[in-house]
Design a protein with these regions (language model features):
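Nucleic-acid-binding surface
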Residues: 1-135
């Protein structure tokens, strides 16, 4: 429903983790990303949690998926992991750690792919020790 009423939004963070089967968390809200200067869509249901991305960050690592007949723009696996570290104060460090662990151990993305998006999100210093531990 969100994708139909707001086709420009990108599903991210906990919603993207759930779509990629990378978390045990069940988000109570739909997490969406919008550009810095965009207005968030107004919807009474489902509840939306909006985060703002820079133009470069919003364009990087977005893929289109077909879910229940709707075309969704979703952040890819390595981009979602980097975003979780960027917004770790919102999603929690535990969620970010679970995401990077499941991604690397499950071979859903390589360390280099995650690192590329960490550079886009400017979280290399935060993410480096965790990636080194998993290497």
């Amino acid at each position: 429903e969100v994708a139909q009423r707001a086709p420009r939004v990108v599903f991210c963070l906990l919603t993207a983790l759930r779509l990629h089967d990378l978390t045990t968390q069940l988000p109570h809200e739909v997490w969406i990303a919008i550009g810095n200067k965009e207005h968030p869509p107004r919807m009474s249901y489902p509840r939306l949690r909006t985060v703002r991305f820079s133009t470069a960050s919003l364009a990087a690592g977005v893929e289109t998926r077909e879910v229940e007949g709707a075309r969704l723009r979703v952040t890819g696996v390595p981009k979602t992991v980097a975003d979780c570290f960027k917004f770790r104060s919102k999603v929690g460090l535990g969620v970010a750690l679970e995401a990077v662990r499941e991604t690397i151990r499950g071979r859903r993305a390589t360390i280099d792919e995650v690192w590329r998006y960490a550079r886009v999100d400017r979280v290399q210093k935060v993410l480096r020790p965790y990636l080194e531990a998993l290497a």
